[in-house]
Amino acid sequence: MLSPQRALLCNLNHIHLQHVSLGLHLSRRPELREGPLSTPPPPGDTGGKESRGPCSGTLVDANSNSPAVPCRCCQEHGSSIENQQDPSQEEEAVSPSDPGCSSSLSSCSDLSPDESPVSVYSRDLPGNEDANPQPSTLELGSPLAPAGPSTCSPDSFCCSPDSCSGISSPPGPDLDSNCNALTTCQDLPSPGLEEEEDSGEQDLATSELSETEDGRIDAGKAEPSWKINPIWKIDTEKTEAGWKTIEDSDSGRKTDENTNSSLKTESGKLASCLNTNSGSKIDAGKTDGGWRGDVSQEPVPHRTITSFHELAQKRKRGPGLPLVPQAKKDRSDWLIVFSPDTELPPTGSLGGSLAPPREVTTFKELRSRSRAQPPPVPPRDPPAGWALVPPRPPPPPVPPRRKKNRLGLQPIAEGLSEEGRAASPRAGEEASASQEPEEPRAHAVVRSSWSFAGVPGAQRLWMAEAQSGTGQLQEQKKGLLIAVSASVDKIISHFGAARNLVQKAQLGDSRLSPDVGHLVLTTLCPALHALVADGLKPFRKDLITGQRRSSPWSVVEASVKPGSCTHSMGSLYSQVSRLAPLSSSRSRFHAFILGLLNTKQLELWFSSLQEDAGLLSLLYLPTGFFSLARGSCPSLATELLLLLQPLSVLTFHLDLLFEHHHHLPVGLQQAPAPSCPPPALQQTMQAVLHWGERLAQSLRGTSGESTTDSSTPSARPPAGSWWDQLTQASRVYASGGTEGFPLLRWGPRRHGTTAEAAQEAPPPTEQTTPGRSVWLGRLFGVPGCPSETESGAFKSRRPSSWLPPTVSVLALVKRGTPPETPPEALVSSPGSVVQADRAVRALCDHTAAGPDQLSFQRGELLRVIATVDEDWLRCGRDGVEGLVPVGYTSLVL
């Protein structure tokens, strides 16, 4: 919508162009002008361009005003009054509400303030000009002229200079400048503007004359003249209480009003009528071009034309054509009704049958609305149950930021109320922008981004559920407690078979009843391991190495520091750390749980771990079990302690190395020889051992036993066995000397028994010289013989594919079988792999936290004795041994 000033100026310019176009059209075609003796207009035509009275002898001007009709106001006022132009009245002169002229707001030439549409229009008609300037209207609020023939009618706004001339004709006492019948001088009509509304808007009772679309004039009655009525301010002191508003949507409906005037509204139009009664009566004897009304007579229908466009349409139709019905009102332009400041009549003059007032928008109201601030929207309560922290007072509202729904930022769907679902991002497409609360920053403060690393399936969780304790995250934590509860129930049921205390003690001993050890290691230990590992940070910050991998065993290490636990827990930790067979952190954690069961301190350790807030914040994420149990869900910690409480009553004697003895990994279980090997493998092993003995004897030069044992290995190993394949493969390696042995390379093998080989060997065996034994060793590819390098026998050999292996099976057989290692030596076997000369350099000063650890200073060289696991080394310094953290040392190459 345009500003009020521009809208008023555009409307005046539009009226000005209509005046100019109509004047040019009439000046070029004089035949369109209506003469005095022309055919009278049809009864339905209420345009009333001229009257049949005394002014019917001359042509009319562009406003259909006859120059013969004198201006009643020209005799009294002088040139000073005529030359005055009131800009305030011109400001208040509004555009007509007629649809024909209200649908265009096109840009046109500006209308200067000193040129009214009438004055410009009158210049386009040559020959009708007069020396007298255009009379001006009275100023708003000025005192009215005295009653008499010289009183200036408000209709003089639209009169031409010709009609206002006093030379044309003598003034008539009952006609104004537009040939309109005037009332007595005591009556001053206060015309106004009426806007027609097809939709039935409220009608405000203002000072305006009635307007009808199809005003019908009876044949016997005089034609009413047309008037273009500006809007005048109402002088409430001069008017009596004669206001009346009539709303009628029925065509043909007649309403009787006051005795002084009456109106007729037709064709479904809403009209408001102003009846002004200043104590005068209508002259019934003078009916030329005016109204005819009497108290007892039928009211004459009157039509007031307020549109120049309607006048132009009537002139173009001609006198014989019917009136073109008005087009449907264009509601898009004339939504502003131009009305004076005094819009309402006096409150005491309103009748009882008033229609509801019409909504009238003035420039004054528009200015007040634009200056007024919009009413504050009442804040709405945010959806309940959104986060773990209470909502804070919101900062100044900002427009909410729309985000895409990502899989990593989905809210928890279970347990949400209807408000929570409407406000959650998943339901964002159902909730419109008008339903969002005015303080969106309250949710932005609550939605803290927590890391869910290490929690399975937690990448789909973007916010903890609510204070009520329901949600997928808490259901996951309850699942950990369910596993602990199931394992405790199985252990209690195992002890339920005992009849007395002695049987209970026997059922709790892993040496007497291994079932209890298996039950604890397969059910309780994995459940507690998963519970401690839940929400654990993957790495811990370290001063030297930067970060160290976290595990449940690192939680045990941090929880048993001096001053943070009892002495018994510290000694148990030292005992488990010294167990060399426990190489993994999981096996150490399981052994620690077994030790806590033996000392009945399992519940106590979990309770002390839960109370250490600094340790939990250092090791765990906010979504971990212990973090939630200490923060928002203390019921989880209480339930865990209640589940572990029955185990403190039972008596356990569990071996800390029970897992090492009974639950070895699959690779270690295959290392010892099977109890029942297959027969082919037994024969192969027997043949290897027997042949090794014979070969050793032959190399030593003893031949007495060869004949005695010649019949022993008569049983040849079956074809396809491991020993047969090894025998065939050994024939590939042949000596290149001059002994005359044929060179056989992956050809058909001559399968002979060891007895045949013994028959080939009598000549060398009879000679007890050491050279013969060297030859036999060289026959089987045994390296290290001094005669090979001296005689250069290997010079004629083929390339590397024919070279014998550096270490062969026969060379190992020559060395003999090592003595069996006692079982006690298996405990210290990992340390034997480490070389004795390995050393590490200390990177920092370290004080031993336990009796099994080694204290050292920065830069010292420590001798590595054994590798305990990936985190600890057993080192020695100055005859003192102990455990050293791997992260505090660097290997010396």
UniProtKB/Swiss-Prot annotation:
Question: Could you tell me which residues belong to the region Interaction with IKBKG?
Answer: 599-665
Q: Biased composition, Pro residues: where in the chain?
A: 373-382, 390-399
GO cellular component terms attached to this protein's record:
cytoplasmic vesicle; cytosol; early endosome; Golgi apparatus; microtubule; microtubule cytoskeleton; nucleus; postsynaptic density
InterPro entries recorded for this chain? Run_dom, Run_dom_sf, RUN_RUSC1, RUSC1_2, SH3-like_dom_sf, SH3_domain
List, alphabetically, the Pfam families matched.
Answer: RUN, SH3_9
Transmembrane feature ranges = none
- Keyword Nucleotide-binding assigned to the entry: answer is no
GO process annotations (BP): protein polyubiquitination
- Keyword set for this entry? Cytoplasm, Cytoplasmic vesicle, Cytoskeleton, Endosome, Golgi apparatus, Microtubule, Nucleus, Phosphoprotein, SH3 domain, Synapse, Ubl conjugation
Q: Which residues form the RUN domain?
A: 515-659
Localization: Cytoplasm; Nucleus; Cytoplasm, Cytoskeleton; Cytoplasmic vesicle
Q: Where is the composition biased (Polar residues)?
A: 77-87, 177-187
Low complexity: compositionally biased ranges: 95-117, 149-165, 702-714, 754-770
Q: Where is the composition biased (Basic and acidic residues)?
A: 237-257
Location of region: Interaction with TRAF6: 463-598
Task: Consult the record and explain the modifications the protein receives after translation.
Answer: Phosphorylated on serine residues following nuclear translocation.
For the region Disordered, give the residue spans: 31-223, 237-332, 339-358, 366-444, 700-721, 751-772
Q: In which tissues is it expressed?
A: Expressed in brain, brain stem and spinal cord (at protein level).
Any one GO molecular function term: actin binding
Free-text domain note: The RUN domain is necessary for NGF induced nuclear redistribution.
Q: What does this protein do?
A: Associates with the adapter-like complex 4 (AP-4) and may therefore play a role in vesicular trafficking of proteins at the trans-Golgi network. Signaling adapter which plays a role in neuronal differentiation. Involved in regulation of NGF-dependent neurite outgrowth. May play a role in neuronal vesicular trafficking, specifically involving pre-synaptic membrane proteins. Seems to be involved in signaling pathways that are regulated by the prolonged activation of MAPK. Can regulate the polyubiquitination of IKBKG and thus may be involved in regulation of the NF-kappa-B pathway.
> Which proteins does it associate with, and in what oligomeric form?
Associated component of the adapter-like complex 4 (AP-4). Interacts with IKBKG and TRAF6. Interacts with F-actin, acetylated actin, TUBB3, STX1A, KIF5B and KLC1.
Under which name does UniProt file this protein? AP-4 complex accessory subunit RUSC1
Source species = Mus musculus (Mouse)
Q: What is the lineage of its organism?
A: Eukaryota, Metazoa, Chordata, Craniata, Vertebrata
